[in-house]
């Protein structure tokens, strides 16, 4: 099993979309990239923690590659808007790929380069080493499935 951690706006919609991909065996929403190893939704919404809302995926690379996950990532959000997705604005809604190793970093950079030619605006998606990931509160997990 491998892990991918991706920021692409409010985590509720992307979580359900990623959960339907063949090869994704588990999803979890959380916060990543911030100043501390623990935080809350309320704190993240202040914009002072520097965390992004993210979806963490456990996936089987024999069924789906990290590259295919990233291509899907670019299909389901607008990577050309800075710190916003749809009606949501703030640094917690930024487009960001959090890599776990050099191989994921290289793949991320290549996919961004390839995807840049598909969009009319420049992709603003950041790539960063995973830092201070923590799961979101239970009520956020599988939020849209519970409704």
Regions found by a protein language model. Name each.
Residues 1-147:
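Flexible coil/turn and secondary-structure edge motifs
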């Amino acid at each position: 099993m491998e892990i991918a951690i991706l920021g692409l706006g409010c985590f509720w919609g992307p979580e359900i979309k990623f959960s339907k991909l063949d090869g994704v065996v588990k999803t979890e929403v959380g916060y990543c990239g911030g100043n501390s190893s623990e935080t809350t939704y309320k704190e993240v919404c202040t914009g002072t923690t520097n965390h992004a809302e993210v979806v963490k995926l456990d996936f089987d690379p024999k069924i789906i590659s990290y590259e295919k996950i990233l291509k899907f990532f670019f299909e389901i959000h607008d990577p050309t808007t800075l710190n916003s997705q749809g009606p949501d604005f703030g640094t917690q809604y930024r487009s960001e790929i959090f890599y776990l190793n050099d191989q994921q970093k290289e793949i991320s950079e290549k996919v961004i380069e390839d995807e840049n030619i598909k969009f009319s605006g420049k992709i603003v998606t950041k790539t960063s080493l995973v830092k201070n990931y923590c799961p979101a509160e239970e009520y956020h997990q599988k939020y849209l499935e519970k409704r």
